[in-house]
Amino acid sequence: MKKRLAIAISFLLAFMLFLSACGGSTIRMATGGNTGTYYAYGTAIGQVLGEKTDLSFNIQSTGASKANIQLIAAGEVDLAIVQNDVMDYAYKGTDLFTGEQTQDFSAMAALYAEVCQIVADPSAGITSIEDLKGKNVSVGDAGSGVEFNAKQILEAYGITFDDINKQNLSFSASADALKDKKIDAFFCTAGAPTSAITDLATSNAITILNVDDEHAQALIADYPFYAQYPIPAGTYNGVDEEVKTLAVKATFIVSNKLSEDTVYQMTKALFENKDAITTAHAKGAELDPAYAVESISVPFHPGAEKYFKEIGALS
């Protein structure tokens, strides 16, 4: 009996080793809500990388950045899309992650810009960030990354939340409130163009406020996850001049438990299959190795670092 059990166990171990040698590991990817960009883009990337590597991808709809970091820390996912500012908070235990510090993840690659857009009603007499004092301003959902973006940008101009009539509204609710003259301005951190602002600009005059170079550089010095970003003229109806602002980055992070080889394989496939990814989702056009390593304030996973050094994106 014992001999037969030993033979069975040996066979099972050999079979498991065979499966391991054949590859086919499943990567659990956390994205965002199933109607959002994170989910659609993550699905597109998973499909392409699943075809181009020996990995398969299980795409999960989630509550986005903070939830995704918590899922990696809990060992429930292996790969996630997050904003690089929220990633910074988690790694350092600040802001959204005060008292909840986690360093169970590493950076893999920045993917695309999420632009800090400050939209104002020109009839409210707002032409600059300084003009927001005393105004009704939505700063995004309470406790969101957008709220912290708003807090940091305002503070760079000497304005606190006590200096405005702060409201916490979603992007679409903010756009509706501005249209109905219930607020004077709102903060929105998202790709540019983004639908809430595009829809608003088709029926209402809007102004998008500049973050000037001096204040932008001061913010970047304090918060290295920011980068300067120009919103091209014509991005929104009636906004006919370039707007200078800041952006954070939608970024892939990975569990520290993933092997160097697995993360190297994913990173390499991500950039070598840019055309196929772009065909599957328009955000693929922003994939760029040089951009992928800028404004990343946490360590890269050794597998990602190996790839970026190999192609000269990191020294």
Roles of regions detected by a PLM:
Residues M1-I7, L13:
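Positively charged n-region of N-terminal signal peptides that target proteins for export
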Residues L17-A21:
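C-terminal motif of bacterial Sec signal peptides marking the signal peptidase cleavage site
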Residues S25-K52, S56-F57, E114-D180, V298, ...:
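Bilobed "Venus flytrap"/periplasmic-binding protein-like clamshell domains
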Residues T37-A73, L79, V239-D240:
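Extracytoplasmic small-molecule ligand-binding "clamshell" domains
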Residues Y41, L169, A173, D180, ...:
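An extracytoplasmic/periplasmic, membrane-proximal ligand-sensing/linker region
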Residues N84-V86, T94-L96, Q103, A124, ...:
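Pocket-lining segment of extracytoplasmic ligand-binding domains
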Residues P122-I129, L258-D261, L314:
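Short helix-loop capping/hinge motifs at secondary-structure junctions, enriched
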Residues K135-Q152, F225-I296:
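Ligand-binding clefts/hinges and TM-proximal coupling segments of bilobed small-molecule sensing domains
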